C-alpha cells in the first residue's frame, strides 16, 4: 500500500470524482490517498479497519473464513464504492477480508480524526443510505439471477468480473459456492468453454480466447 498526503494531488482526485459533494463539512484536510496493487489486502479479516475508504478506481473481492477452514466468496467491489461503511455505523464488528483484483486507488478518511464528524453529517448519511440501499438491491438481484439463468451465462459473467489481465484464476471451490453449483458441474462447463475456444487452459490458469462470446453470454443477465 502506498499513502499520499499531497493536498494538491488529493484535491484533483476529489474534484474529478466529486468526493467533496458527499459531505457538508470541509473534508480535504482529513483525506489521504491510498493505492493498492493486485493481490494486496485492503482489509484483513478480524482486524479493525481504521479508515473509511471510497474506491475511485479498481476492483476487489470480499470473502470470509469459517471455523471449519472453508472460505466463502461473498461479493465484489467496483468503483465507485465505499469500503468499511458498515463498521463506521457499528453494524459489523468483525471485518471481512478485502483483496485487490485490479490495482485500486482509494480516498481514505481516518476514523480517529473524523468518525464523529461523519456520523453527525446529514449530507453524508443521506449518500451513505443511498449507497447501502443500492448495494442491497444489487445483491438481491444477483441472488435471484443464480436461480433464473442458465449456468453458462452466469459463469461467463463471473469470469469477466474476476479476470485479471485476460486470465481467470479463481479457486474452483469458492467459485462453485458463490455461483451455487457443484464443483463437478463448474469443471464440466469450464472444460466445455475450452472446447468451444472461449477459454484456453494452461496449468491452473484459464486464458480468455473469445471475449466477445463471453460478453454476449453475460449480457443476458443484465436487467
How does the language model describe each region?
Residues 50-62, 79-80:
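Glycine- and acidic-residue-biased ligand/ion/polar-headgroup-sensing regions
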Residues 42-47:
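Short phosphate-coordinating micro-motif centered on Lys-Gly-acidic
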Residues 1-38, 83, 87-88:
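Cyclic nucleotide-binding regulatory module and flanking cytosolic helices
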Residues 73-130:
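Cyclic-nucleotide recognition modules
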Residues 101, 118-184:
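Polybasic "coupling" helices that flank or enter modular domains
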Residues 37-38, 56-57, 78, 102:
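A cytosolic small-molecule/anion-sensing beta-strand core signal
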Residues 149, 158-223:
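Phosphate-/nucleic-acid-contacting segments
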Residues 32, 41, 59-64, 82, ...:
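Short beta-strand segments in beta-sandwich/barrel cores
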Amino acid at each position: 500500500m502506498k499513502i499520499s498526503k499531497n493536498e494538491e494531488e488529493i484535491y484533483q482526485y476529489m474534484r474529478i470524482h466529486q468526493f467533496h459533494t458527499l459531505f457538508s463539512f470541509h473534508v480535504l484536510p482529513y483525506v489521504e490517498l491510498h493505492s493498492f496493487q493486485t493481490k494486496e489486502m485492503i482489509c484483513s479479516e478480524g482486524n479493525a479497519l481504521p479508515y473509511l475508504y471510497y474506491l475511485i478506481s479498481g476492483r476487489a473481492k470480499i470473502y470470509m473464513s469459517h471455523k471449519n477452514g472453508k472460505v466463502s466468496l461473498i461479493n465484489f467491489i467496483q468503483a465507485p464504492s465505499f469500503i468499511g461503511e458498515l463498521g463506521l455505523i457499528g453494524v459489523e464488528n468483525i471485518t471481512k477480508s478485502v483483496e485487490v483484483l485490479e490495482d485500486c486507488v482509494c480516498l481514505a478518511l481516518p476514523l480517529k480524526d473524523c468518525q464523529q464528524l461523519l456520523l453527525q453529517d446529514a449530507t453524508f448519511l443521506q449518500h451513505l443510505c443511498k449507497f447501502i440501499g443500492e448495494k442491497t438491491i444489487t445483491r438481491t438481484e444477483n441472488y435471484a439471477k443464480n436461480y433464473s439463468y442458465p449456468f453458462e451465462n452466469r459463469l461467463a459473467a463471473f469470469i469477466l468480473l474476476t479476470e485479471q489481465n485476460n486470465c481467470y484464476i479463481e479457486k474452483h471451490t469458492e467459485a462453485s459456492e458463490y455461483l451455487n453449483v457443484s464443483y463437478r458441474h463448474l469443471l464440466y462447463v469450464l472444460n466445455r468453454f475450452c472446447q468451444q475456444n472461449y477459454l484456453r487452459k494452461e496449468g491452473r490458469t484459464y486464458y480468455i480466447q473469445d471475449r466477445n462470446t463471453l460478453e454476449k453470454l453475460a449480457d443476458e443477465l443484465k436487467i
